[in-house]
């Protein structure tokens, strides 16, 4: 199961490369993360480190439009919250913690532009070692491993006490902190997920959290989650323990609860609603011109089963 989860990062990287190759991430707010340049450099190094992983990414430029739309939406939805966090705390020392970071490279543009940010990437040991080796091979990206504001550490998020101890060691709990969990919590057991959420909310006094995951669907006739789960078992020997439990945006969001004396706000929506309500009309037109999309109903069904969640809390508002 652990190895199967780690391999999902190759899928995520391939999807990101496809969306970059087809220019989905060349406009809108994602321009600020310079994905084409950063991932181009990363792939060049990846080729030297792991031809197996590189080979899977190399041919990903032909992803179906509906898949590129999905990658675009999850990327910009998280980018939006990262930029908002940075803008709201532009004069303060802050922290960003990406749990289950995989090959995500947001830290490159964030650290290049914001000297007030400490950026912590956490994932399984094998994933972290691959990322470290790839970064080291790059004359450009290797500098981030020497940056005092960047931390790349291995941990098993299911071991909640160890994870919280690591966070307490690397972070200052009193500083504003943004947690990112992108398609991560869905692979964790419910008990450990809840314990991790509760522990992080207790640890950081002024925190924000953006999370993206699939959800099974709450309608009794909705078979999306059941079919997805069965396909993952058959093809990947992979489980999503909470897919059918946290099957609506409201249930998904209910796991984040404040301590009694905290200011707390919470926003959650499915990705189809996000696309319709949050993506500007001109941006919709831009991506529409990139590839012909004739599966609009399929896009609606798929994105209705993914959720973007955001919350922030402050235990010391005064």
From Swiss-Prot:
GO terms for biological process: methylation; protein-containing complex assembly; regulation of autophagy. Methylates the carboxyl group of the C-terminal leucine residue of protein phosphatase 2A catalytic subunits to form alpha-leucine ester residues. S-adenosyl-L-methionine binds at residues 74, 100, 123, 156-157, 182. It is an enzyme of class 2 (transferase). It catalyses: [phosphatase 2A protein]-C-terminal L-leucine + S-adenosyl-L-methionine = [phosphatase 2A protein]-C-terminal L-leucine methyl ester + S-adenosyl-L-homocysteine. This is Leucine carboxyl methyltransferase 1. Keywords: Methyltransferase, S-adenosyl-L-methionine, Transferase. InterPro entries: LCMT1 (IPR016651), Ppm1/Ppm2/Tcmp (IPR007213), SAM-dependent_MTases_sf (IPR029063). PANTHER family: LEUCINE CARBOXYL METHYLTRANSFERASE, LEUCINE CARBOXYL METHYLTRANSFERASE 1. Pfam families: LCM (PF04072). Coiled coil: none annotated. Belongs to the methyltransferase superfamily. LCMT family. Gene3D superfamilies: Vaccinia Virus protein VP39 (3.40.50.150). The keyword tRNA-binding does not apply. The gene is PPM1. Its EC number is 2.1.1.233. GO terms for molecular function: protein C-terminal leucine carboxyl O-methyltransferase activity. Disulfide bonds: none annotated. SUPFAM superfamilies: S-adenosyl-L-methionine-dependent methyltransferases (SSF53335). It comes from Candida glabrata (strain ATCC 2001 / BCRC 20586 / JCM 3761 / NBRC 0622 / NRRL Y-65 / CBS 138) (Yeast). The keyword S-adenosyl-L-methionine applies.
